[in-house]
């Protein structure tokens, strides 16, 4: 059985912009920020409707690889830590045993499904067959890490960098924070920004040169480069915070120059939305 009261935390987290704090029995991160519209978009991805309608009485082994990742996204959105359950099946069984939780989820899903207006497009990456991401969709970092295979049910990624790689899959995720209010003259150079709706200027980490191993991978196009951007009011102290990134899809190398860091121009396979371009082009960024 799920701990008493956790269904209230689940529902409240979907309907409130902020949870003041979570008690020791809760599994939600403190001050989790998620609005109604974002929650509606998230719910549409998680198979919530399918799972809730069946009272979570499903066989995890029957899910496709993409559906399994969707379910693992659900796990991390609820618990935000590895090891709460040993398997997705154990999570489904625990949910199914709590009838009140199931009924609350059903009611919430139906209500928010009606509000969900998500201008998303099919994934354009080479890994679209297995990744549950939609271009222009909004995702937390934990959800992205599930998609690229660095978050597992028994292991959570410890990455706090502006990029994250899974060499087994040949993927690199670029996490770019677009800073709205940054101090002129700051020692930090914010040099990641949209050149137009289909071109993005990005700087590598300071250690990367064209001759370095990772620099060669960029030049030789050995990695599938996935671009994620989000707007921040100020410089974030913790890049792992659960604010959403907009997925701009796989990008391709156009040009590069410089060393430590390299300055790279990427071409987006799908043009970014005008609303994204309006902040990504106007403000410089922290990557």
Question: Which residue ranges define each predicted feature?
Answer:
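C-terminal helical accessory/scaffold domains
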Residues: 1-133
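Acidic, glycine-rich low-complexity segments with interspersed aromatic residues
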Residues: 3-52, 134-244
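Compact mixed alphabeta submodule
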Residues: 237-287
